[in-house]
Structures are given as C-alpha cells and as structure tokens.
C-alpha cells in the first residue's frame, strides 16, 4: 500500500494509491473550515511542509463528504441496482474494501518538489489530520499488503515503510500523520522538530493569498516546462511551447451557497506566451464543441463550455468556471433524458 505514494513494488501499494488519490483529487467542493489546533504541538499542518516543496495544495475532505448539495448530485442520477445508491454508500463500500473510513479524515495538505523526477524516486507527501485510529489504519495497510510493515525509529517517531523503504507513513500526533516517499516523510519530521526550514517564500505567500477555499493549490513551474511538456500534440498542428513559459500556477475550487466555482491562474514569464496560450485554450474549446458527442452528452457539452471564462491581463491568464447546483442537476436530467 505504501508503494503507491512512491514506487509500486508490492500488491498492497494499490490501496494507498487509491487513498491518496481520493484525498487529493476529489472534485466535490464546499466551504472550507477553520481548524482548531491539534494535539502534539501541531497548530496548522501547512507549517509542517518542507521549504524545498515547489508545489503545495490543500483539500478539506470532511466538508466535501458532508455537503448535502454534493451528496444530492451523486444520489440523483439513476443507478444499477448493484451500484452504491448514495454517497454514503460509496464511502461504506470503500471502508468495507479497504478498512479505511474516509470520513475519519478532515483535511489534507499535499506537497511535492517537482524538480525531483520519478527516475530519482520522486518527492511527494501528504499530511493528513483527522479523528482516526492509527492502529486501525496500520492494520488496514498491512492487511492489504499481506504482511507486516517495517518499523524504524527516526528522531523519536516510528516510521512504517514498505519492503524496499521507498515509501512510508509516520504519525506526528494522535490526529496527524504523513504519508509519501520516505524522504519527504523524514523531512516533515525534521520540520516539526525544528531541524529543517518550513515552507516559505513565494509558494507560501501565494498559498496564503488564495484564501479559504475547499481545494487550493499553487505550483512554481520552473521545472515543469520544457522538460516534461511536448512542443506539440501528435497529429495536430497545435503548438504547446507557450506553456513552457509558465512561472507559477494556482488552482482554487470552492462552493459558496449553492454555487460552485473553479479558477486557474497561469502566470507566464511574458505577455506574448500568455496571449498564445489564451488563443490555444480558446481554440481547444472550439475544437471540443465541434467534436462528435454521444447523444446523451449533446446537451451537456455546450452548456459546460458556456460556463468557461478566459481572461488575460498582460502575462496573467485566468481561466474560470462557475455553475450552480441546480444547473448541474438540470444538466444531469437532460443527459438522462437524451
């Protein structure tokens, strides 16, 4: 299970991969919560992120899972009899399969140093806070692995790791744990003990400027441009090179009242690249609108594209999307009626 945060070496890695994936990618959003300090001296888990991270994000899972609007969005569409009928049923099934109740987790902060490639093992971790039972969580991990985790003491903390010690989990207090590759797990422990500098600078400043949002993320793109992004798409005359000039990007997903919104801001090194990217995003919307769409989606795609707003101010490109819960329900009903 631990391998899924880093290297997939054992069968048990699949379950932690599912857990981490759910914690950082669920797109249901709701108002964020103001969290009280947790025991063990951890007042805010963002303060445990190491300075070397150039990507950091936050998800408030408890509000996502308890929001009635989003539960209704899942519950409304007709389903097969064998499928989970409600969102709570989905969570129950996941708990039955994995031994992990996602409702025990309140909030997660994920972080990465994107300059460390997968060939070098990568650098990614998630710090999670909630009301969970550590022994039950370890039992679930070991059950999925079919064996025991290795345990090593590090600066007064037990680090539980997979067989090749590439990925690990450590409990920082009764209500906080960190999972990820073993290097960032150790770095978080060092930050907590005052032996390593916590996140600061432009990443932390931008993170704070994003305010209270259910899901938010900031990334410095210094290592994400030309090294990982192709210049074009195979078979299509589309130039992707302007995106290599992104210096910083942010993402916010939130819900206020019954309205959901998403906003992505791309900060380019120059206005020319931002303008080219703006034209490319607009072109992509036109291409999607022209593509053949299955009958059940013919009413959905145009409505969603109409919700997309693209604005540019010099070297800053902003892409936003806003929709109400009732509009989502109408789209679902129109899709079912097609």
Which stretches of residues belong to each language-model region?
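Bacterial N-terminal signal peptides
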Residues: 24-33
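Short, Lys/Arg-enriched N-terminal segments with co-localized hydrophobic residues
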Residues: 1-14
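Bacterial signal peptide processing site
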Residues: 39-41
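Single conserved position on a long alpha-helix in the C-terminal lobe of the eukaryotic protein kinase
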Residues: 57, 100-201, 264, 319-333
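A cross-kingdom marker for long, charged
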Residues: 289-338
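One face of beta-strands
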Residues: 55-57, 124-130, 247-253, 258-266, ...
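C-terminal motif of bacterial Sec signal peptides marking the signal peptidase cleavage site
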Residues: 35-37
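An internal, short helix-loop-strand segment that often contains or flanks glycine-aspartate motifs
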Residues: 68-103, 148-258, 274, 290, ...
